[in-house]
Amino acid sequence: NESVECNSQQLLSLVLKGTHMTWDSLPTQVDASKHSFIILANTFREQTHQEWNDKYLESFGLITSDGKLTNAGLLFVDNCTVFQSRIFCTRWTGLYKDDTISSVEHRDNLVLLLKYGIDFIKNYTMSGWVKMPNYRLNLPDYSGRAIFEGLVNHLIHRDYTVMGGEVHIDIYDDRVELVSPGAMLDGTPVSYTHLRAHETK
């Protein structure tokens, strides 16, 4: 047993845990009627091939029964203003954080951040292919599904009580690393993922 000094962010996390609540479920005083979810609705149609219904907003936990946005709702509105809803994308020149080939920052709602992150990784990793007898076999450096699920996990499950924090996408010659804010009480980071390139590269 040991005592660990908590900062304000860690204290907030403990309070939320003690009350069995999460940051994203907390209601705000922002009227949902003043915001739109067009990007979310269009993405829902594309992914599910079903029609969007505004009733989903409450069932998804994005608005309250009295028409207020939750913190999660703020992250999905078209004009997201949550400061820490950001990603930093960097393509490094080699195996370490030395010089950069490209670096870009995006601040937007979670649907667009997911798109921007996937696009950046596609643009700065190899997508080779080999010709087979009757078709072409694509050989990308990284599984598209693994990239998608990794980014979703880091965007959704990151600690949004960390003000000024953001998700980092770092691409090296041999790997892609995803890092998001969040740590155990002793400071040990828990939100870290790296993907290795296929040997077919």
Descriptions of predicted regions:
Residues 197-201:
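A short, hydrophobic C-terminal helix/tail in secreted or cell-surface proteins
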Residues 2-196:
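Active-site helix-to-loop segments that bind/position phosphate- or nucleotide-bearing substrates
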